[in-house]
Amino acid sequence: MSINRNHQFYKLVFEGILLTMFFSLYSCSNNDNEAVDVIPPSSYDSLKPIGFGENTTGGNNQNITVVTNAEQLAEAVSGANPATIYVQGDITLDNMLAVGSNKSIIGLYGATISNLNCNENAGIFLLKGSNNVIIRNLTLLGPGAYDIDANYSDNISLVGAKNVWVDHCDIQDGIDGNFDIVEGSDSICVSWTRFRYLIAPKGGGSGGSDDHRNCNLIGNSNNTADLDAGHLNCTFICCWWGDGCSERCPRVRFGKVRVVNCLYDGNDFKYCVGYGVYSNIYVEKCAFVSEKAKKKALKDYRGDKDFNIKVVDCLGIDDVELSQGEWGQFVPNYDYKAFNADMVESVLKNSENGAGATLKILL
């Protein structure tokens, strides 16, 4: 026991020395307000959007600002002028923020944004018609699942948004959902992001559900082909659906969606991936490790007749290809070298550089 304690002590001392050195060097040499990640990222991390969303550049290091409160953040994310916004500390919102175009919203190490309202003022970021937005390295906290049947009350809501990259976020306890992509949104990449519910669900909301821990909805109606056909194309890379997630991880209508190197280890799944009307889904080298995830991996949602889903080289479930309708299976043709499914859990759960808001970004 004493050897283990000594080992941990010296490990902490060494890490402290390293961080002190980085802080010292950075304060002396970095005077242009560019951020640095002081802990090396995972060797599997591309550090850029891949596939759908690959052309997203966000604020492109222009008009750099640091925000520390809700008023500053609301002002910084508005409008269409390019801006790179660093979030410092803990920010609490009273209502959802409308995010404009050409923005990078990046959390410095440990940054959180929360909105704990259980009403129509719930939600954190609304991207309605926005284009070219990056959201990175933020912990986003909602009040817990409570079905109030409100539009756009998720921690992140994309409504007709294009070219969006969400990377290394920890998205928790959304009131309606954690992160929904609807109404013709397109070219979306979600990478290295953790989804979970740590607050017990609350019943009695106007929507009627007693357990609305429904994480990621892609397409919110079967009757929106005029908006959604040819859109809702998304890539999920190295994402982790865990504690408390019940369903919609994701649940897809209309879009082409690739889910690759993702982890499912929660114990509350009613299902993991839901395939609905005109969905075209490619699930590749993912790890379904909990018993619930293995048994409830896929769901044919309400008997929709036009869909394609293919599962390839995953851990915990068999390969399968299911198809109804006259169109062909979507096969990704963009460059991403997926690693083996039996490595997914250890890579994504690495506390130093795995999925979630793990980037040690400093200014």
Each PLM stretch: what is its role?
Residues 74-82, 89-106, 113-136, 142-162:
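Extracellular beta-strand-rich solenoid/capping regions of secreted or surface-exposed proteins
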Residues 102-111, 131-144, 160-173, 185-207, ...:
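Right-handed parallel beta-helix
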